[in-house]
Protein backbone atom coordinates (compact mmCIF):
# COMPACT_ATOMS: atom_id res chain seq x y z
CA UNK A 1 0.00 0.00 0.00
CA UNK A 2 1.48 3.35 -1.07
CA UNK A 3 0.59 6.83 0.08
CA UNK A 4 -0.55 9.20 -2.69
CA UNK A 5 -0.85 12.34 -0.58
CA UNK A 6 -1.07 12.69 3.17
CA UNK A 7 -3.86 10.51 4.49
CA UNK A 8 -4.72 8.89 1.15
CA UNK A 9 -3.45 5.41 0.26
CA UNK A 10 -3.32 3.69 -3.12
CA UNK A 11 -5.04 0.43 -2.22
CA UNK A 12 -5.06 -1.32 -5.58
CA UNK A 13 -4.87 -0.86 -9.34
CA UNK A 14 -8.31 -1.00 -10.92
CA UNK A 15 -7.12 -0.92 -14.51
CA UNK A 16 -4.35 0.10 -16.86
CA UNK A 17 -3.92 1.35 -20.40
CA UNK A 18 -1.30 2.41 -22.89
CA UNK A 19 -1.08 5.90 -21.40
CA UNK A 20 -1.76 5.34 -17.71
CA UNK A 21 -3.61 3.54 -14.95
CA UNK A 22 -6.71 3.70 -12.78
CA UNK A 23 -6.03 3.44 -9.05
CA UNK A 24 -8.26 3.04 -6.00
CA UNK A 25 -7.55 5.62 -3.30
CA UNK A 26 -8.85 5.18 0.25
CA UNK A 27 -8.70 7.78 2.99
CA UNK A 28 -6.95 6.28 6.00
CA UNK A 29 -9.21 8.05 8.50
CA UNK A 30 -12.62 8.48 6.87
CA UNK A 31 -12.47 5.44 4.55
CA UNK A 32 -13.64 7.58 1.63
CA UNK A 33 -12.96 5.78 -1.65
CA UNK A 34 -12.05 7.48 -4.93
CA UNK A 35 -10.99 6.17 -8.34
CA UNK A 36 -7.97 8.04 -9.72
CA UNK A 37 -7.12 8.02 -13.42
CA UNK A 38 -3.47 8.75 -14.09
CA UNK A 39 -2.13 10.00 -17.41
CA UNK A 40 1.61 9.35 -17.50
CA UNK A 41 2.07 9.86 -21.25
CA UNK A 42 1.37 13.56 -21.48
CA UNK A 43 4.24 13.73 -23.98
CA UNK A 44 1.77 12.33 -26.52
CA UNK A 45 -0.33 15.27 -27.73
CA UNK A 46 -3.33 13.11 -28.65
CA UNK A 47 -3.44 11.46 -25.21
CA UNK A 48 -3.16 14.80 -23.41
CA UNK A 49 -5.84 16.33 -25.64
CA UNK A 50 -8.26 13.47 -24.98
CA UNK A 51 -7.62 13.76 -21.26
CA UNK A 52 -8.40 17.48 -21.40
CA UNK A 53 -11.60 16.88 -23.37
CA UNK A 54 -12.66 14.18 -20.95
CA UNK A 55 -12.36 16.63 -18.06
CA UNK A 56 -14.41 19.23 -19.96
CA UNK A 57 -17.18 16.71 -20.67
CA UNK A 58 -17.25 15.45 -17.08
CA UNK A 59 -17.75 19.00 -15.82
CA UNK A 60 -21.02 19.19 -17.75
CA UNK A 61 -22.49 16.06 -16.23
CA UNK A 62 -24.28 15.14 -13.03
CA UNK A 63 -26.69 12.19 -13.19
CA UNK A 64 -27.36 9.08 -11.14
CA UNK A 65 -26.33 6.80 -14.00
CA UNK A 66 -23.17 8.70 -14.96
CA UNK A 67 -19.91 8.18 -13.07
CA UNK A 68 -19.37 11.15 -10.75
CA UNK A 69 -16.52 13.56 -11.38
CA UNK A 70 -14.79 15.03 -8.32
CA UNK A 71 -11.93 17.01 -9.82
CA UNK A 72 -8.51 16.88 -11.43
CA UNK A 73 -4.92 17.65 -10.58
CA UNK A 74 -1.60 18.06 -12.39
CA UNK A 75 1.84 17.34 -10.98
CA UNK A 76 4.64 17.87 -13.46
CA UNK A 77 4.22 15.42 -16.36
CA UNK A 78 1.43 13.53 -14.55
CA UNK A 79 -2.26 14.37 -14.75
CA UNK A 80 -4.99 12.95 -12.55
CA UNK A 81 -8.79 12.74 -12.75
CA UNK A 82 -10.68 11.82 -9.58
CA UNK A 83 -13.91 9.91 -10.07
CA UNK A 84 -16.50 7.99 -8.12
CA UNK A 85 -15.37 4.48 -7.20
CA UNK A 86 -17.87 2.02 -8.70
CA UNK A 87 -17.31 -1.01 -6.49
CA UNK A 88 -19.82 -3.18 -8.33
CA UNK A 89 -17.37 -3.74 -11.18
CA UNK A 90 -18.01 -3.82 -14.92
CA UNK A 91 -21.31 -4.69 -16.55
CA UNK A 92 -19.69 -7.30 -18.79
CA UNK A 93 -18.81 -9.30 -15.68
CA UNK A 94 -22.53 -9.88 -15.06
CA UNK A 95 -23.09 -11.35 -18.52
CA UNK A 96 -22.76 -15.11 -18.71
CA UNK A 97 -21.18 -16.07 -22.05
CA UNK A 98 -23.66 -17.74 -24.44
CA UNK A 99 -26.51 -17.19 -21.96
CA UNK A 100 -26.71 -13.55 -20.91
CA UNK A 101 -28.78 -12.93 -17.82
CA UNK A 102 -32.32 -13.01 -16.50
CA UNK A 103 -34.69 -10.64 -18.34
CA UNK A 104 -35.51 -8.76 -15.13
CA UNK A 105 -31.84 -7.94 -14.59
CA UNK A 106 -31.31 -7.12 -18.27
CA UNK A 107 -34.29 -4.79 -18.25
CA UNK A 108 -33.13 -3.02 -15.09
CA UNK A 109 -29.65 -2.43 -16.49
CA UNK A 110 -30.93 -1.45 -19.93
CA UNK A 111 -33.42 1.08 -18.57
CA UNK A 112 -30.69 2.70 -16.48
CA UNK A 113 -28.34 2.80 -19.47
CA UNK A 114 -31.05 4.45 -21.55
CA UNK A 115 -31.71 6.94 -18.76
CA UNK A 116 -28.03 7.87 -18.63
CA UNK A 117 -27.73 8.19 -22.41
CA UNK A 118 -30.91 10.28 -22.56
CA UNK A 119 -29.35 12.65 -20.03
CA UNK A 120 -26.10 12.84 -22.02
CA UNK A 121 -28.01 13.76 -25.15
CA UNK A 122 -30.01 16.38 -23.26
CA UNK A 123 -26.68 18.02 -22.45
CA UNK A 124 -25.59 17.81 -26.08
CA UNK A 125 -23.02 15.10 -25.34
CA UNK A 126 -22.51 11.91 -27.38
CA UNK A 127 -20.61 9.06 -25.73
CA UNK A 128 -19.54 7.27 -28.96
CA UNK A 129 -18.12 4.18 -27.25
CA UNK A 130 -20.97 2.59 -25.35
CA UNK A 131 -20.30 -1.08 -24.52
CA UNK A 132 -20.43 -3.27 -21.39
CA UNK A 133 -16.72 -2.73 -20.73
CA UNK A 134 -17.38 1.02 -20.39
CA UNK A 135 -20.36 0.65 -18.07
CA UNK A 136 -19.77 0.21 -14.35
CA UNK A 137 -21.95 -0.69 -11.37
CA UNK A 138 -22.04 0.91 -7.95
CA UNK A 139 -22.27 -0.96 -4.66
CA UNK A 140 -26.04 -1.33 -5.13
CA UNK A 141 -25.72 -2.62 -8.69
CA UNK A 142 -26.87 0.61 -10.29
CA UNK A 143 -25.44 1.62 -13.66
CA UNK A 144 -22.63 4.16 -13.96
CA UNK A 145 -21.70 5.05 -17.54
CA UNK A 146 -17.98 5.80 -17.72
CA UNK A 147 -15.05 6.31 -20.10
CA UNK A 148 -15.70 9.61 -21.84
CA UNK A 149 -12.44 9.70 -23.78
CA UNK A 150 -14.26 9.56 -27.13
CA UNK A 151 -17.23 11.69 -26.05
CA UNK A 152 -17.96 14.93 -27.87
CA UNK A 153 -20.37 17.84 -27.72
CA UNK A 154 -22.67 17.59 -30.74
CA UNK A 155 -25.17 20.28 -29.76
CA UNK A 156 -24.33 23.75 -28.47
CA UNK A 157 -26.81 26.54 -27.84
CA UNK A 158 -29.47 24.56 -29.66
CA UNK A 159 -27.44 24.04 -32.82
CA UNK A 160 -26.55 20.45 -33.69
CA UNK A 161 -23.60 19.48 -35.83
CA UNK A 162 -23.11 16.21 -37.72
CA UNK A 163 -20.24 14.02 -36.57
CA UNK A 164 -17.57 12.70 -38.91
CA UNK A 165 -15.01 10.92 -36.73
CA UNK A 166 -15.17 7.16 -37.13
CA UNK A 167 -14.66 5.98 -33.58
CA UNK A 168 -15.91 3.39 -31.15
CA UNK A 169 -15.75 -0.40 -31.00
CA UNK A 170 -16.72 -2.20 -34.21
CA UNK A 171 -19.38 -4.66 -32.97
CA UNK A 172 -21.17 -1.81 -31.16
CA UNK A 173 -20.94 1.10 -33.60
CA UNK A 174 -23.81 2.06 -35.88
CA UNK A 175 -23.48 1.25 -39.61
CA UNK A 176 -23.64 4.89 -40.65
CA UNK A 177 -20.52 5.66 -38.59
CA UNK A 178 -18.47 3.53 -41.00
CA UNK A 179 -19.60 5.17 -44.21
CA UNK A 180 -20.50 8.84 -43.78
CA UNK A 181 -21.14 11.72 -41.44
CA UNK A 182 -23.76 10.80 -38.89
CA UNK A 183 -26.07 12.14 -36.20
CA UNK A 184 -24.97 11.54 -32.64
CA UNK A 185 -28.17 10.38 -30.96
CA UNK A 186 -29.17 7.52 -33.31
CA UNK A 187 -25.58 6.24 -33.26
CA UNK A 188 -25.53 5.99 -29.45
CA UNK A 189 -28.98 4.39 -29.49
CA UNK A 190 -27.71 1.69 -31.85
CA UNK A 191 -24.90 0.87 -29.42
CA UNK A 192 -27.49 0.51 -26.66
CA UNK A 193 -29.33 -2.01 -28.83
CA UNK A 194 -26.22 -4.15 -29.28
CA UNK A 195 -25.65 -4.01 -25.51
CA UNK A 196 -29.22 -5.26 -25.01
CA UNK A 197 -28.51 -8.26 -27.25
CA UNK A 198 -25.40 -9.03 -25.20
CA UNK A 199 -27.38 -8.79 -21.95
CA UNK A 200 -30.11 -11.14 -23.17
CA UNK A 201 -28.10 -13.60 -25.27
CA UNK A 202 -24.58 -13.56 -23.86
CA UNK A 203 -23.08 -12.98 -27.29
CA UNK A 204 -22.68 -10.26 -29.87
CA UNK A 205 -24.67 -10.35 -33.10
CA UNK A 206 -21.82 -9.48 -35.50
CA UNK A 207 -18.19 -8.49 -35.88
CA UNK A 208 -19.12 -5.17 -37.46
CA UNK A 209 -22.25 -3.63 -39.02
CA UNK A 210 -21.14 -3.95 -42.64
CA UNK A 211 -22.42 -6.06 -45.53
CA UNK A 212 -19.04 -7.79 -45.65
CA UNK A 213 -20.03 -9.42 -42.35
CA UNK A 214 -22.32 -12.42 -42.94
CA UNK A 215 -24.06 -12.11 -39.56
CA UNK A 216 -24.95 -8.48 -40.15
CA UNK A 217 -25.99 -9.20 -43.73
CA UNK A 218 -28.31 -11.90 -42.42
CA UNK A 219 -29.83 -9.47 -39.94
CA UNK A 220 -30.58 -6.97 -42.71
CA UNK A 221 -32.26 -9.80 -44.62
CA UNK A 222 -34.40 -10.64 -41.54
CA UNK A 223 -32.79 -14.04 -40.98
CA UNK A 224 -33.71 -14.40 -37.31
CA UNK A 225 -33.80 -18.19 -36.99
CA UNK A 226 -30.15 -18.27 -35.92
CA UNK A 227 -28.33 -17.33 -32.73
CA UNK A 228 -28.46 -14.87 -31.01
CA UNK A 229 -31.96 -13.97 -32.20
CA UNK A 230 -33.38 -17.38 -31.24
CA UNK A 231 -32.43 -16.68 -27.61
CA UNK A 232 -34.70 -13.62 -27.45
CA UNK A 233 -38.42 -13.92 -26.87
CA UNK A 234 -40.76 -12.21 -29.32
CA UNK A 235 -41.28 -9.10 -27.20
CA UNK A 236 -37.56 -8.48 -26.72
CA UNK A 237 -36.85 -9.25 -30.36
CA UNK A 238 -39.45 -6.73 -31.50
CA UNK A 239 -37.68 -4.02 -29.49
CA UNK A 240 -34.26 -5.01 -30.78
CA UNK A 241 -35.53 -4.88 -34.36
CA UNK A 242 -36.73 -1.32 -33.81
CA UNK A 243 -33.41 -0.23 -32.31
CA UNK A 244 -31.07 -2.05 -34.68
CA UNK A 245 -32.67 -0.56 -37.77
CA UNK A 246 -29.89 0.23 -40.27
CA UNK A 247 -31.58 3.44 -41.42
CA UNK A 248 -30.95 5.97 -38.61
CA UNK A 249 -33.99 8.06 -39.59
CA UNK A 250 -36.25 5.05 -38.93
CA UNK A 251 -34.46 3.89 -35.80
CA UNK A 252 -36.29 4.07 -32.49
CA UNK A 253 -35.63 7.13 -30.36
CA UNK A 254 -35.04 6.82 -26.63
CA UNK A 255 -38.57 8.07 -26.00
CA UNK A 256 -39.95 5.29 -28.20
CA UNK A 257 -37.74 2.72 -26.47
CA UNK A 258 -39.09 3.80 -23.09
CA UNK A 259 -42.63 3.33 -24.36
CA UNK A 260 -42.11 -0.16 -25.81
CA UNK A 261 -43.97 -2.99 -24.08
CA UNK A 262 -40.76 -4.89 -23.23
CA UNK A 263 -39.35 -1.84 -21.45
CA UNK A 264 -42.59 -1.31 -19.53
CA UNK A 265 -43.27 -4.95 -18.64
CA UNK A 266 -42.82 -6.08 -15.02
CA UNK A 267 -40.54 -9.12 -15.13
CA UNK A 268 -40.34 -11.50 -12.21
CA UNK A 269 -36.83 -11.43 -10.81
CA UNK A 270 -35.02 -14.75 -10.52
CA UNK A 271 -32.07 -15.45 -8.25
CA UNK A 272 -29.60 -16.62 -10.89
CA UNK A 273 -26.67 -14.32 -10.15
CA UNK A 274 -24.71 -16.84 -8.11
CA UNK A 275 -25.30 -19.78 -10.44
CA UNK A 276 -22.56 -18.83 -12.88
CA UNK A 277 -20.11 -18.20 -10.06
CA UNK A 278 -20.75 -21.35 -8.05
CA UNK A 279 -20.90 -23.89 -10.84
CA UNK A 280 -17.90 -24.99 -12.84
CA UNK A 281 -19.98 -26.58 -15.53
CA UNK A 282 -23.29 -24.71 -15.90
CA UNK A 283 -21.96 -22.11 -18.28
CA UNK A 284 -20.18 -24.77 -20.31
CA UNK A 285 -23.42 -26.69 -20.78
CA UNK A 286 -24.81 -23.96 -23.00
CA UNK A 287 -22.73 -24.52 -26.10
CA UNK A 288 -23.86 -22.19 -28.84
CA UNK A 289 -21.80 -20.14 -31.24
CA UNK A 290 -20.66 -16.80 -29.90
CA UNK A 291 -19.49 -13.85 -31.96
CA UNK A 292 -16.63 -12.35 -29.96
CA UNK A 293 -15.04 -8.94 -30.15
CA UNK A 294 -11.38 -8.16 -29.72
CA UNK A 295 -8.86 -5.39 -29.91
CA UNK A 296 -9.11 -5.35 -33.69
CA UNK A 297 -12.70 -4.29 -33.10
CA UNK A 298 -11.57 -1.04 -31.49
CA UNK A 299 -11.13 1.83 -33.90
CA UNK A 300 -9.75 5.26 -33.04
CA UNK A 301 -9.04 3.82 -29.60
CA UNK A 302 -7.28 6.90 -28.33
CA UNK A 303 -8.88 6.88 -24.88
CA UNK A 304 -6.85 3.93 -23.67
CA UNK A 305 -5.88 5.29 -20.25
CA UNK A 306 -9.42 5.29 -19.03
CA UNK A 307 -10.33 1.77 -18.03
CA UNK A 308 -9.57 -1.79 -17.37
CA UNK A 309 -10.80 -2.78 -20.82
CA UNK A 310 -8.37 -0.40 -22.51
CA UNK A 311 -5.15 -1.30 -24.20
CA UNK A 312 -2.13 -2.77 -22.48
CA UNK A 313 1.55 -2.69 -23.54
CA UNK A 314 1.95 -5.19 -26.33
CA UNK A 315 3.07 -8.74 -26.52
CA UNK A 316 4.73 -10.34 -23.54
CA UNK A 317 7.49 -12.92 -23.53
CA UNK A 318 7.12 -16.41 -22.21
CA UNK A 319 7.72 -16.67 -18.53
CA UNK A 320 10.93 -18.65 -18.49
CA UNK A 321 12.98 -15.47 -18.20
CA UNK A 322 11.35 -14.23 -15.03
CA UNK A 323 13.98 -15.47 -12.62
CA UNK A 324 13.74 -17.87 -9.70
CA UNK A 325 10.54 -18.43 -7.80
CA UNK A 326 10.56 -16.49 -4.51
CA UNK A 327 10.73 -18.63 -1.42
CA UNK A 328 8.34 -16.81 0.86
CA UNK A 329 4.60 -16.38 0.37
CA UNK A 330 4.85 -12.68 1.16
CA UNK A 331 7.14 -12.26 -1.82
CA UNK A 332 4.75 -13.83 -4.32
CA UNK A 333 1.64 -12.00 -3.16
CA UNK A 334 0.56 -8.83 -4.90
CA UNK A 335 2.41 -5.82 -3.51
CA UNK A 336 0.48 -2.68 -2.66
CA UNK A 337 -2.68 -4.54 -1.70
CA UNK A 338 -3.42 -4.88 1.99
CA UNK A 339 -6.62 -5.91 3.66
CA UNK A 340 -5.38 -5.88 7.23
CA UNK A 341 -5.39 -2.08 7.71
CA UNK A 342 -7.62 0.31 6.30
CA UNK A 343 -6.74 14.55 5.25
CA UNK A 344 -9.93 14.83 3.24
CA UNK A 345 -10.90 14.78 -0.41
CA UNK A 346 -10.39 18.48 -1.00
CA UNK A 347 -6.79 18.17 0.19
CA UNK A 348 -6.12 15.87 -2.73
CA UNK A 349 -7.76 17.84 -5.51
CA UNK A 350 -7.31 21.04 -7.39
CA UNK A 351 -10.18 22.58 -9.37
CA UNK A 352 -12.62 20.38 -7.47
CA UNK A 353 -16.34 20.07 -7.48
CA UNK A 354 -17.15 19.35 -3.84
CA UNK A 355 -19.37 16.30 -4.02
CA UNK A 356 -19.85 13.45 -1.60
CA UNK A 357 -17.60 10.46 -2.03
CA UNK A 358 -18.25 6.96 -0.86
CA UNK A 359 -17.72 7.08 2.87
CA UNK A 360 -18.74 4.38 5.29
CA UNK A 361 -17.48 2.01 7.90
CA UNK A 362 -16.34 -0.39 5.21
CA UNK A 363 -12.85 -1.78 5.47
CA UNK A 364 -10.52 -1.87 2.45
CA UNK A 365 -11.42 -5.57 2.24
CA UNK A 366 -15.02 -4.66 1.55
CA UNK A 367 -13.91 -2.03 -0.97
CA UNK A 368 -12.46 -4.73 -3.19
CA UNK A 369 -14.31 -4.30 -6.46
CA UNK A 370 -16.93 -6.98 -7.03
CA UNK A 371 -16.01 -9.48 -9.68
CA UNK A 372 -17.11 -12.99 -10.60
CA UNK A 373 -13.77 -13.89 -12.12
CA UNK A 374 -12.01 -14.87 -8.89
CA UNK A 375 -11.76 -17.81 -6.54
CA UNK A 376 -10.03 -18.99 -3.37
CA UNK A 377 -7.52 -21.84 -3.51
CA UNK A 378 -6.38 -24.44 -1.01
CA UNK A 379 -2.72 -24.09 -2.02
CA UNK A 380 -0.31 -21.53 -0.63
CA UNK A 381 0.99 -18.64 -2.71
CA UNK A 382 4.07 -20.43 -4.04
CA UNK A 383 2.15 -23.53 -5.06
CA UNK A 384 -0.59 -21.42 -6.63
CA UNK A 385 1.91 -19.51 -8.78
CA UNK A 386 3.44 -22.78 -9.95
CA UNK A 387 0.02 -24.24 -10.79
CA UNK A 388 -0.94 -21.12 -12.73
CA UNK A 389 2.30 -21.01 -14.69
CA UNK A 390 2.03 -24.70 -15.55
CA UNK A 391 -1.57 -24.32 -16.71
CA UNK A 392 -0.82 -21.21 -18.75
CA UNK A 393 1.94 -23.11 -20.55
CA UNK A 394 -0.44 -25.99 -21.32
CA UNK A 395 -3.04 -23.59 -22.66
CA UNK A 396 -0.47 -21.96 -24.93
CA UNK A 397 -0.68 -18.58 -23.23
CA UNK A 398 2.14 -16.07 -23.29
CA UNK A 399 2.67 -14.89 -19.73
CA UNK A 400 4.91 -12.66 -17.68
CA UNK A 401 5.33 -11.98 -13.99
CA UNK A 402 5.09 -8.19 -13.83
CA UNK A 403 5.51 -7.93 -10.07
CA UNK A 404 5.19 -10.27 -7.09
CA UNK A 405 1.72 -11.75 -7.05
CA UNK A 406 0.72 -10.58 -10.53
CA UNK A 407 0.89 -12.52 -13.79
CA UNK A 408 -0.05 -10.89 -17.09
CA UNK A 409 -1.42 -13.31 -19.68
CA UNK A 410 -1.56 -12.60 -23.41
CA UNK A 411 -3.47 -14.78 -25.85
CA UNK A 412 -5.86 -14.42 -28.79
CA UNK A 413 -9.61 -14.58 -29.01
CA UNK A 414 -11.57 -16.39 -31.71
CA UNK A 415 -11.00 -13.53 -34.11
CA UNK A 416 -7.24 -13.75 -33.61
CA UNK A 417 -7.39 -10.41 -31.83
CA UNK A 418 -5.24 -9.85 -28.77
CA UNK A 419 -6.72 -10.66 -25.37
CA UNK A 420 -4.81 -9.60 -22.25
CA UNK A 421 -5.75 -10.28 -18.65
CA UNK A 422 -4.05 -10.33 -15.27
CA UNK A 423 -4.08 -12.85 -12.43
CA UNK A 424 -3.42 -11.38 -8.98
CA UNK A 425 -2.73 -13.38 -5.83
CA UNK A 426 -4.11 -11.68 -2.73
CA UNK A 427 -3.91 -12.90 0.85
CA UNK A 428 -7.32 -12.47 2.42
CA UNK A 429 -8.57 -13.88 5.71
CA UNK A 430 -5.54 -16.22 5.85
CA UNK A 431 -6.43 -17.61 2.43
CA UNK A 432 -5.21 -16.99 -1.10
CA UNK A 433 -7.61 -15.30 -3.50
CA UNK A 434 -6.78 -15.57 -7.21
CA UNK A 435 -8.33 -12.55 -8.89
CA UNK A 436 -8.52 -12.32 -12.71
CA UNK A 437 -9.00 -8.94 -14.40
CA UNK A 438 -9.43 -8.04 -18.06
CA UNK A 439 -6.86 -5.60 -19.43
CA UNK A 440 -7.53 -5.66 -23.18
CA UNK A 441 -10.07 -7.26 -25.46
CA UNK A 442 -13.61 -8.56 -25.24
CA UNK A 443 -15.15 -9.16 -21.84
CA UNK A 444 -17.25 -12.15 -22.90
CA UNK A 445 -14.26 -13.88 -24.45
CA UNK A 446 -12.23 -13.17 -21.31
CA UNK A 447 -14.90 -14.84 -19.19
CA UNK A 448 -14.77 -17.94 -21.39
CA UNK A 449 -11.04 -18.21 -20.76
CA UNK A 450 -11.65 -17.75 -17.04
CA UNK A 451 -14.13 -20.64 -17.02
CA UNK A 452 -11.52 -22.85 -18.71
CA UNK A 453 -8.90 -21.89 -16.12
CA UNK A 454 -11.31 -22.36 -13.24
CA UNK A 455 -12.35 -25.81 -14.43
CA UNK A 456 -8.76 -26.93 -14.98
CA UNK A 457 -7.87 -25.82 -11.44
CA UNK A 458 -11.01 -27.22 -9.81
CA UNK A 459 -9.12 -29.62 -7.53
CA UNK A 460 -7.27 -26.67 -5.98
CA UNK A 461 -10.28 -24.36 -5.58
CA UNK A 462 -11.47 -23.96 -1.99
CA UNK A 463 -14.99 -25.04 -1.22
CA UNK A 464 -17.20 -24.22 1.70
CA UNK A 465 -18.35 -20.98 3.38
CA UNK A 466 -16.45 -17.70 3.48
CA UNK A 467 -16.88 -14.72 5.78
CA UNK A 468 -19.59 -12.20 4.90
CA UNK A 469 -17.22 -9.35 3.85
CA UNK A 470 -15.36 -11.73 1.55
CA UNK A 471 -18.63 -13.02 0.12
CA UNK A 472 -19.66 -9.43 -0.66
CA UNK A 473 -16.34 -8.65 -2.33
CA UNK A 474 -16.37 -11.81 -4.43
CA UNK A 475 -20.03 -11.66 -5.50
CA UNK A 476 -20.71 -14.96 -3.76
CA UNK A 477 -23.36 -13.81 -1.32
CA UNK A 478 -25.86 -16.68 -0.99
Map each language-model feature to its residues.
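Protein kinase glycine-rich loop
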Residues: 11-18, 22
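Conserved short submotifs of the Hanks-type protein kinase catalytic core
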Residues: 76-90, 94
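Activation segment signature within eukaryotic-like protein kinase domains
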Residues: 109-110
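Terminal C-lobe "cap" of eukaryotic-type protein kinase domains
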Residues: 245-271
Amino acid sequence: MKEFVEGWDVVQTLGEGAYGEVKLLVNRVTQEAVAMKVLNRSDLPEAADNFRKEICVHRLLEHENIIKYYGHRREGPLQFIFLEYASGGELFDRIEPDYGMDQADAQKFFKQIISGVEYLHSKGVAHRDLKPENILLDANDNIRISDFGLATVFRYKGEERPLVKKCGTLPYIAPEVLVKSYHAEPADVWSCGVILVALLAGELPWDKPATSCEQYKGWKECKITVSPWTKLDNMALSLVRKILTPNPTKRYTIEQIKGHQWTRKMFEAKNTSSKWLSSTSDSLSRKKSCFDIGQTGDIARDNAPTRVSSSQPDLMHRGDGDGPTPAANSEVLAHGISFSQPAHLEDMLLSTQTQGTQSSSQSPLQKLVKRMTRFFVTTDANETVQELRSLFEKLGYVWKTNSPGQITVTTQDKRKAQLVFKANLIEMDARILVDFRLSRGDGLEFKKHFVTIRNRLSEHIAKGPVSWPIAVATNSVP
